[in-house]
């Protein structure tokens, strides 16, 4: 473990790792992880932590045996536990001479461009001061997070943060070694996949078949997070947080867990904001021909390739693109409103004028305003 290979790292610590499956925070485990992070900062690495555990801390504080299922009471536990969680981190980092800061985010905070940039500037300023920021979703107001909605888990939040600050590495620490060729609890001969260059449908099926729930997420959400982060030019590693000095080993370039290779194309700030998917107003479903033209040939989206639109959006809004099976392809700024897209979907370019009195050009979304995930 000589030096480190990364200047800026986001480390996601999940509930299963922090509690050891007991439902209570494992202070010894947390102390060891914080010690590794402190050692990393002394090597000049900037670190942000995305930490679960607020509800577990609140449950322990209130002496509850079981976690209630109703959302309002989970929010109460999150409110109680968040201060406890921050206090633990403060106690663990203080002996190393490090100050901690709390960063509570919601989807709405980052959904507009100014909020995205403000959050980015704050996190960068904290890193410049040498402060360890502990990020979590604001469970008290973000109902989607506790109900495990699509973008409401800390795997995806960690990818958002990595996207936001242009991290070099997103390290997702959990209680298994990484992604396997089969569920290792059912197939003893399952092999660890050490490197992933592309997240394919086959990999997604492997993740969906995993029996390990890993807190509120699971391997499916970890693949979603890896897709967003790697598309943003960030290296991603999923690894077992129980391995001795795992953070220091991975930061120095040692091989552990499953590594997801980043896209060769480094998106700019505007493209990264679009990639976050937080500002979308609707969805445009496109056919396989359009998917191929966009993904393989870097073409614009034309009306002929559109199958349907969902949601209400206007010209200039950001929309999600998905294929005929509902799989996300990317995001783009639309030249047409949802009403107009419904009118011209499937039409060839020379037919648009017969439907719309004044059209906005042949492209529904121009290639320059489109990012592929």
Curated annotation (Swiss-Prot):
Alphabetical keyword list: Amino-acid biosynthesis, ATP-binding, Cytoplasm, Kinase, Nucleotide-binding, Proline biosynthesis, Transferase
Assigned GO CC terms: cytosol
Listed Pfam families: AA_kinase, PUA
Disulfide topology: none
Subcellular localization, as worded in the UniProt entry: Cytoplasm
Documented EC number(s): 2.7.2.11
Keyword Kinase included in the entry's annotation: yes
UniProt-recorded Gene Ontology molecular function terms: ATP binding; glutamate 5-kinase activity; RNA binding
Pathway: Amino-acid biosynthesis; L-proline biosynthesis; L-glutamate 5-semialdehyde from L-glutamate: step 1/2
Any single GO BP term: L-proline biosynthetic process
Enzyme class: transferase
SUPFAM superfamilies, per database record: Carbamate kinase-like (SSF53633), PUA domain-like (SSF88697)
Catalytic activity from the UniProt record: L-glutamate + ATP = L-glutamyl 5-phosphate + ADP
Binding locations of substrate: 52, 139, 154
Segments forming domain PUA: 281-359
Residues bound to ATP: 12, 216-222
TM annotation in the entry: none
InterPro entries in the record: AceGlu_kinase-like_sf (IPR036393), Asp/Glu/Uridylate_kinase (IPR001048), G5K_ProB (IPR041739), Glu/AcGlu_kinase (IPR001057), Glu_5kinase (IPR011529), Glu_5kinase/COase_Synthase (IPR005715), Glutamate_5-kinase_CS (IPR019797), PUA (IPR002478)
Family: Belongs to the glutamate 5-kinase family.
Cited function: Catalyzes the transfer of a phosphate group to glutamate to form L-glutamate 5-phosphate.
NCBIfam families for this protein: proB
Protein name: Glutamate 5-kinase
